[in-house]
């Protein structure tokens, strides 16, 4: 098979040069590429979950390429001559959306597919309730040229979120899952709308503490009274001075007097008879003179 290659010269005139290709060799190379694509690491039935997209309220639309780096790498390294004969198919596209906002809030999510090579837009959903979890399922009905995909002119997912919540806060998270198959055959499918499968809210992850555990929780953190104490009922309080009875006078009898003598210059004193019933609790016959002489002045 012979083809003509046209180039632009420096003078601005176009010149042509011919080159020859072998259809058999081209098909053989295309088949080899298809076999590589069927390997487990790049299998055509292997769905890709590359990332998660956090959708912020009022932020710029999020744009994600739906052609994996593996397919672009194959296109760049192995398809310099047969890029026109290799295609990327998107036979399955799933978009799992999980909201971050409550049912009491409001908002909408817009999802579109954009073929950058042809600049065509396909609506996935233009007004999805941002509070509702769901899975979108569909496909792109045309093939993407492998040479375009290698240059980045591939199929893009465009997502935008707007809600009644705080600006730039997380409205929800989108998990794109897709299949990008590299093949030498083109697809020509009827266009179909994406299916939407709502996801119901689940039951609580775990049950709350039972009454016994809650009681123990309170007892561990609360100081409680003991017994059945209760406050008195309010009554009229009348403050009055208490009148005491007649004062009583007590007499402590003196002991018998002692001779008026002087010991070492110390004046005599009265002897205290502590042995009497109303004594002061000191030994019988105790005198301060003897105490001073025996205890305080033993060396004199």
Swiss-Prot record:
One BP annotation, GO: transport of virus in host, cell to cell
Subcellular location: Host cell junction, Host plasmodesma
GO annotations of cellular component type: host cell plasmodesma
Recorded superkingdom: Viruses
Keyword Nucleotidyltransferase: no
Pfam family, one: Bromo_MP
Primary location class: host cell
Alphabetized UniProt keyword annotations: Host cell junction, Transport, Viral movement protein
InterPro entries recorded: Bromo_MP
Role: Transports viral genome to neighboring plant cells directly through plasmosdesmata, without any budding. The movement protein allows efficient cell to cell propagation, by bypassing the host cell wall barrier. Acts by forming a tubular structure at the host plasmodesmata, enlarging it enough to allow free passage of virion capsids.
Family: Belongs to the alfamovirus movement protein family.
Annotated protein name in UniProt: Movement protein
